[in-house]
Amino acid sequence: MGAVAEEVCAQLRERGARPYVIPFGGSSALAARGYVESGDQIRMQLPDVEHVVVALGSGGTMAGLIGALGEDRVLGVDCGAVAEPADVVAALSSELTGRDVTTASLRIRLDQVGPGYGVLHEPVMEAMNATARAEGVVLDPTYSGRAMAGLMAAVRDGDIRPNQRTVFLHTGGLPGLFGHTQTVRRSVAALDSVTFG
């Protein structure tokens, strides 16, 4: 796909156009700038935030947050979308910030991929149901559900301690709900126990 896209871009440039190829997952240093702004908003509203937990797909969201908050505050939960997530995030973050962001400096949980990208497994189902019951929030099983499972695991293993100011960034995922209708039905059924008020 990359070679074909470059060929088409070259043809368009010859005609005076200014094409831009949107990479897999939409992640590029340019796209990550949107999440720099998101991170700036988090920092302005919660200056003492210690952890921002986010799903790590193609890397742009995490890289943008790192651009605003630094590596020490951002915890990415790998969803299995790319083969070497730390390499991808380090490269995007380095390009975005203009400094050398190393893979060793990143906080990435690799324990929620389970059997593979988009394949539902028990910790994600538990996180989805617990979040629906406790907060009335439905999570998708591919991204936000895995991120919440990673947040819960980080609390269990002490990476995130009680009373530390933590933000969970729900990045959407509506299309991911349609491939897992039974799981979503269970999460929605859990909403019956939620009291809104």
Go through each PLM region and give its residues.
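Small/polar-residue-rich loop-to-helix segments that shape phosphate-bearing ligand pockets
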Residues: M1-L46, R107-E126
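Predominant activation on well-ordered alpha-helical scaffold segments within soluble catalytic domains
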Residues: E6, A10, V36-R43, A63-I66, ...
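Generic secondary-structure signature for well-ordered alpha-helical cores
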Residues: A10-R18, D40, M44-D48, G67-E71, ...
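Structural motif
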Residues: Y20, H51, R165-V167
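Active-site flanking residues adjacent to catalytic metal/cofactor-binding acidic residues
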Residues: I22, V77, L139
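Glycine-rich phosphate/pyrophosphate-binding loop at beta-loop-alpha junctions
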Residues: A29-P115, L169-G197
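Active-site-adjacent helical/loop segments in soluble small-molecule enzymes
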Residues: A104, R109-N163
